């Protein structure tokens, strides 16, 4: 008997599970994925690159094992101990072939641009894009909790620009500053638009033939996330 699975639905379900780790900050990974796609689109990327950025954004914190760790990641703009969960998340994904391509950028998604620039390729750019979108969301999430997102946009843009050429790739920051001039970039981060975005992406996702071994791998990923 042939087995089929919608891997888009698997990624989205994993993202929903990760939201439970955040408790007080749901949709963090979803917002990171949405922003990563918007920034990449500004750079003229193709649909395959955008799909990878979206999936990597959804799952970038798959290595976060507790609400306490999640809280530190979303409260501290830059934290020396952040690399551990990136390594663990990459290890988890590397062992699951359908999502193994996400492991390299996720491993590096808290690495500063200054540590990447001497060997900077597609993987490193994707990793720094995740880092950028992740840190934007840390700032935006606080503003949303205070119901002051649009009021705080200038300060968020200024803080991100202050780390250009240090934490973040200058080209990515330029793209962010360009696309984030529009209110629509920020309004898309609210809960309703985020869920609408997820629904649109899921609607036409194809079924893929798979094996029992792959389905067992899916179960293993879920067991790590919700343990």
Please tell me what each predicted stretch does.
Residues 1, 15-16, 34, 137-140, ...:
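Regulatory/sensor and coupling segments of signal-transduction and defense proteins
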Residues 3-45, 216-223:
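Intrinsically disordered, low-complexity terminal regulatory regions
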Residues 7-14, 32, 52-72, 80-91, ...:
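Alpha-helical scaffolding flanking metal-ion-dependent phosphate/phosphodiester catalytic sites
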Residues 18-25, 41-49, 65-67, 117-123, ...:
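Short alpha-helix-to-loop micro-motif enriched in aromatics/charged/Gly
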Residues 42, 84-86, 159, 194, ...:
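Short, surface-exposed, polar/charged, turn-prone segments marking secondary-structure boundaries
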Residues 77:
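Surface-exposed, glycine/proline- and aromatic-rich loop segments on solvent-exposed faces
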């Amino acid at each position: 008997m042939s087995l089929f699975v919608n891997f888009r639905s698997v990624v989205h379900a994993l993202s929903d599970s990760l939201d439970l780790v955040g408790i007080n900050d749901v949709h963090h990974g979803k917002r990171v994925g949405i922003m990563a796609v918007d920034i990449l689109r500004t750079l003229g990327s193709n649909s395959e690159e955008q799909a990878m950025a979206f999936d990597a954004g959804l799952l970038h914190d798959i290595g976060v094992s507790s609400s306490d760790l999640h809280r530190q990641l979303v409260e501290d703009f830059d934290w020396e101990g952040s690399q551990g969960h990136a390594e663990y998340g990459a290890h988890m994904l590397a062992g699951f072939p359908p999502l193994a391509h996400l492991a390299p950028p996720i491993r590096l998604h808290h690495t500063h641009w200054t540590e990447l620039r001497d060997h900077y390729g597609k993987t490193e750019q994707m990793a720094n894009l995740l880092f950028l979108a992740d840190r934007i969301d840390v700032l935006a999430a606080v503003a949303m909790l205070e119901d002051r997102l649009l009021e705080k946009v200038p300060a968020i843009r200024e803080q991100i620009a202050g780390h250009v050429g240090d934490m973040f790739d200058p080209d990515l920051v330029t793209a962010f500053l360009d696309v984030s001039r529009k209110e629509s970039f920020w309004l898309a981060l609210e809960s309703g638009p985020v869920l609408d975005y997820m629904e649109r992406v899921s609607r036409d996702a194809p079924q893929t033939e798979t094996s029992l071994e792959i389905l067992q791998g899916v179960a293993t990923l879920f067991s790590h996330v919700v343990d």
